[in-house]
Amino acid sequence: STEVQSLLPEAIAANTTAFLNTHDRQHPEVMGNPTEGALLLWIRGQAYDYLTLRDSAPIIRQLPFSTERKYMATLVQSAMLEGKAVLYVKGAPEILLSLCNLPTEVRTRYGAQLHQYQSRAMRTLALGYHIVESPTDQEKPLDELIQEGLQLQGIFGIMDPVRSEVPAAIQQCREAGIGVKIITGDTSGTAKEIARQIGLWGESSTD
């Protein structure tokens, strides 16, 4: 919808812990979480100034990311909605999808897209929002507001390419009898694709 599209740049700019170092304007450097930084670079490529967007949406309250809940949330006074309070949420797609009231066919389509991203070793994030109409509701715990339901803004797949020298280094370790394991917070599908790219996973491999 138009509302979903118009709020997306503000959601990315406001609900993040990352910054961009733009001293070299041709090659901005991400400061902070690289996945969050990739989203800032994406809206920058759409000709949005993330700092202007961030400054125009004052933060009311914020819920930091945690590995338990797998999302972060920021309640802002939205410039895009004439000062209304909007709660932006960003995190693991499987968590956010469960918090959105979606038709079955739409949920299935997003699930297929998510699987495609993960099978290509992409990091995945979902974004959603909740408009907080009542001043009283603004005082509620953010977790409670989130449980009231979200409007899905979209799912992002972000590629983090394997460095070219890694497969050869892995092979040298294996030839020397050194066991190599992948430890990651990503999904098993993403981990398997990364393992395939660096030579740790083949057709005969098992979980």
Per-region residue spans from a language model:
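Glycine-rich, often acidic-flanked micro-motifs
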Residues: A176
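Conserved RecA-like helicase motor-core motifs
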Residues: W201-D207
